[in-house]
Amino acid sequence: MMNRVIVGAMGLLAAGAVVVGCSNDKPAGAAQVSSGSNAEVKVDGKDLAGLDLKSVTCVKQGGNINVASAAINGQQGLGVVMTDEATPKVTSLGLVYDGAALAVSEGMGAKVGSADVKVDGKTYTITGEASGADVKNPMAGMITKPFTIKVSCG
């Protein structure tokens, strides 16, 4: 029963993070978009299989930086929302790794995972630990995996 509550809470956190991450009070302005940015995505020290790295797109708009990708044959996907400031902060991150839906999120009184962002010119390196549940076996409990995402934006 507890695992069902955890999985349900993870889903609500992820949905809430997307809504919060995609909304703000700042004027929209013109978006800065870059794609095919030689992205690197590693989870647990390995390349994230099934992710179309050429499709990784970075959009700077309205005070946020949104990083997203397409999947190959519907396997994996990646979504990151971070603040567009001198020291960016990840507000939400979601990815699927080996059948597990993993996230970094902070909201509604709960914190899931952790992430740090380093900036070198137009290159953003996001490192941390994402937590979640195996969607094939949600009763197995929470899992946490280290990740590194490197993407060029601008």
UniProtKB/Swiss-Prot annotation:
It is a lipid-anchor. The keyword 4Fe-4S does not apply. Its main location: membrane. Belongs to the mycobacterial 19 kDa antigen family. Residues 1-21 form the signal peptide. The lineage of its organism: Bacteria, Bacillati, Actinomycetota, Actinomycetes, Mycobacteriales. This is Putative lipoprotein MAB_4074c. A lipid is attached at residue 22 (N-palmitoyl cysteine). Keywords: Cell membrane, Lipoprotein, Membrane, Palmitate, Signal. Pfam families: Myco_19_kDa. It comes from the Bacteria. It is found in: Cell membrane. A lipid is attached at residue 22 (S-diacylglycerol cysteine). The keyword Cell membrane applies. One of its GO terms (cellular component) is plasma membrane.
